[in-house]
Regions:
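N-terminal Rossmann-like FAD-binding beta1-loop-alpha1 element of flavoenzymes
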Residues: 2-27
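Glycine-rich FAD pyrophosphate-binding loop
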Residues: 20-44
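General small-molecule cofactor/ligand-binding pocket signal
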Residues: 26, 79, 223-227
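Conserved donor sugar-nucleotide recognition element shared by glycan-biosynthetic enzymes
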Residues: 37, 181, 205, 209
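N-terminal glycine-rich dinucleotide-binding loop that anchors FAD/FMN and/or NAD(P) in oxidoreductases
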Residues: 41-67
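Mobile amphipathic helical/loop "lid" adjacent to a hydrophobic cofactor/ligand pocket
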Residues: 61-181, 185-186
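Helical element adjacent to the flavin cofactor pocket in flavoenzyme catalytic cores
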Residues: 186-238
């Protein structure tokens, strides 16, 4: 069978990897490189070269079991990574990292900001209360409506929840008020972000995430059409 696959993101690459064994597969990619969200660039610093991932960065063995199996099959190695969260806002001149007390008060003025302490209290409250969305199976309420309805402060919303969402989804902050609250909370719950303790150990691919692209695409690389965006897809009655 002749099969066309659109995109060389992880889904497209895996689909082509499996299907090309028994079918004639052609992959169409709009970018000029293979990998989609998987993109590693080399950064030179003080004479040393460092691979930096700009898209897919981390995973963990608890919530990415199929990805782990794939990496094992491909013979790709990974290693533990530290993961932290920090915020810097030029507009409000606020900077903090809630990991430790010292990083929280990285700006001395934070000691005199009651909003910082209130925001931390609200973060614990959100972790506790957000589970109710999952229990209620509420798929309609938006994140903005939920936070407003629960009376969360603008400081918590704009300097904690939205920046964290931006970091995870690389999305425009203006979109998050309309983001489904259930999807947001479910992702947080699945990845241990609602827990203060017992969070999963995050891992990174040695040498950058590009390391798995070559072995994953080796069997069909010559059938990838780069810089070839798909304009339309038509379904024919006989197919």
């Amino acid at each position: 069978m002749r099969i066309a696959i659109v995109g060389t993101g992880i889904s497209g690459m895996v689909a082509a990897h499996l299907l090309c064994q028994n079918h004639d597969v052609v992959v169409f990619e709009a970018n000029d490189y293979i990998g989609g969200h998987t993109n590693t660039i080399d950064v030179e610093l003080n004479g040393a070269n460092y691979p930096v991932d700009t898209g897919f960065i981390v995973f963990n063995e608890d919530t990415y079991p199929n990805f782990v199996k794939l990496m094992m099959k491909l013979g790709v190695a990974w290693q533990p990574s530290n993961m932290s969260f920090s915020v810097q806002s030029e507009k409000t001149d606020l900077e903090y990292c809630p990991t430790t007390l010292n990083s929280l008060i990285s700006q001395i003025r934070n000691l005199l900001r009651p909003s910082i302490y209130s925001m931390l209290v609200e973060s614990f409250r959100f972790r506790r209360e957000a589970q109710e969305i999952l229990r209620a199976n509420d798929y309609e309420t938006t994140l903005g409506a939920y936070l407003e309805g629960k009376g969360y402060s603008q400081t918590f919303i704009h300097h904690f929840i939205i920046p964290m969402g931006e970091a995870i989804w690389s999305a425009d902050p203006k979109q998050f008020n309309e983001f489904p609250a259930h999807s947001f909370v479910q992702f947080f719950n699945n990845h241990g972000f609602l827990n203060v303790k017992d969070q999963p150990q995050w891992q990174v691919i040695k040498g950058g995430s590009r390391t798995y692209v070559e072995p994953l695409t080796r069997s069909y690389k010559d059938n990838v059409r780069l810089s070839c965006p798909v304009v339309s897809i038509k379904r024919h009655p006989d197919n």
